[in-house]
């Protein structure tokens, strides 16, 4: 079987998967995407005093402001997740979750940690894709804004979301000299570049979903670590952040790459 035959067979398999799951895939994608916000909101409830004390000690902002921070995070994240899953006011929910990401980036000094900053940006990319999906279902927020043909804001959101998802992958690269790590990096980098430029997008994104899912379950198995150990919370954070990016990739699979992509441009050639 030649290379083209293998690629064609893989694309047929991906199309068959999409046909079988097309009714459920967007729901699964949204649930995965908001999972990190849902987990963090629930954690805010159960670790109320610890989170408040941490913010008060770090920023010396006093009891009241620290409590306000926890309340905003709790209500903003749980409320945003409920709106997204119920498909009500999704655009406002996305903007609220964007604000939560920005607030946490500053409050937890993520700006100075490149790895966590890239993951937060990738999470923002997933929200951009969710925003694009909500625009395809409901009324445009940009009604009255002059349109440039096919280059609508939705398509640029899809492009921005795809590019930001690349950042999550970059944090997973292993700079080891063994053959498996080098092969893993090369194949993964090729796939994420295909997703970013929008070439063979659905197949590349679906392959990345399977790959990230395997890595997530293997490396971030927080359920195997006792809850009292700090590593438990660290692995749980990693697990749900990666799950959210998987949700973003599933949205790419469900929606396609959008107009600003090589897949769409090929149709014009």
Curated annotation (Swiss-Prot):
Transmembrane segments: 64-84, 92-112, 179-199, 203-223, 242-262
Entry's localization field: Endoplasmic reticulum membrane; Endoplasmic reticulum-Golgi intermediate compartment membrane; Golgi apparatus membrane
Any one Gene Ontology molecular-function term assigned to this protein's record: cargo receptor activity
Principal location: endoplasmic reticulum
Motif (Di-lysine motif): 266-269
Superkingdom assignment: Eukaryota
Swiss-Prot/TrEMBL GO biological process terms: endoplasmic reticulum to Golgi vesicle-mediated transport; Golgi organization; lipid homeostasis; lipoprotein transport; regulation of lipid transport
GO cellular component terms given for this protein: endoplasmic reticulum; endoplasmic reticulum membrane; endoplasmic reticulum-Golgi intermediate compartment; endoplasmic reticulum-Golgi intermediate compartment membrane; Golgi membrane
Keyword Transmembrane helix: yes
Keyword tags: Endoplasmic reticulum, Golgi apparatus, Membrane, Protein transport, Transmembrane, Transmembrane helix, Transport
Keyword Transmembrane helix: yes
Topology with respect to the bilayer: Multi-pass membrane protein
Biological role stated in the UniProt entry: Endoplasmic reticulum cargo receptor that mediates the export of lipoproteins by recruiting cargos into COPII vesicles to facilitate their secretion.
Record-stated family: Belongs to the SURF4 family.
Domain notes: The di-lysine motif confers endoplasmic reticulum localization for type I membrane proteins.
Protein name, entry field: Surfeit locus protein 4
Gene: surf4
């Amino acid at each position: 079987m030649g290379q083209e035959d293998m690629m064609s067979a893989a694309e047929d398999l991906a199309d068959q998967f999409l046909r079988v799951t097309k009714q459920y895939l967007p729901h699964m994608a949204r649930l995965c995407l908001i999972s990190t916000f849902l987990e963090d909101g629930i954690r805010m409830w159960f670790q109320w005093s610890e989170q408040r004390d941490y913010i008060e000690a770090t920023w010396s902002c006093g009891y009241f402001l620290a409590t306000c921070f926890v309340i905003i995070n709790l209500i903003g994240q749980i409320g945003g997740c409920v709106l997204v899953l119920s498909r009500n006011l999704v655009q406002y929910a996305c903007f609220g979750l964007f604000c939560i990401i920005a607030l946490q980036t500053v409050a937890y000094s993520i700006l100075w940690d490149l790895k966590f900053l890239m993951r937060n940006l990738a999470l923002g990319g997933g929200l951009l894709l969710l925003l694009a999906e909500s625009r395809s279902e409901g009324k445009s927020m940009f009604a009255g804004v002059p349109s440039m043909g096919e280059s609508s804001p939705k398509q640029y959101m899809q492009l921005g979301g795809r590019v930001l998802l690349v950042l999550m992958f970059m944090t997973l690269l292993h700079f080891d000299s063994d053959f498996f790590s080098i092969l893993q990096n090369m194949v993964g980098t090729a796939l994420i570049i295909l997703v970013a430029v929008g070439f063979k997008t659905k197949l590349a994104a679906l392959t990345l979903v399977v790959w990230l899912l395997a890595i997530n379950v293997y490396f971030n198995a927080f359920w195997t670590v006792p809850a009292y150990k700090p590593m438990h919370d660290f692995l749980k954070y990693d697990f749900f952040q990666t799950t959210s990016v998987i949700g973003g990739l599933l949205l790419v699979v469900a929606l396609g790459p959008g107009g600003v992509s090589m897949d769409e441009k090929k149709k014009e050639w």
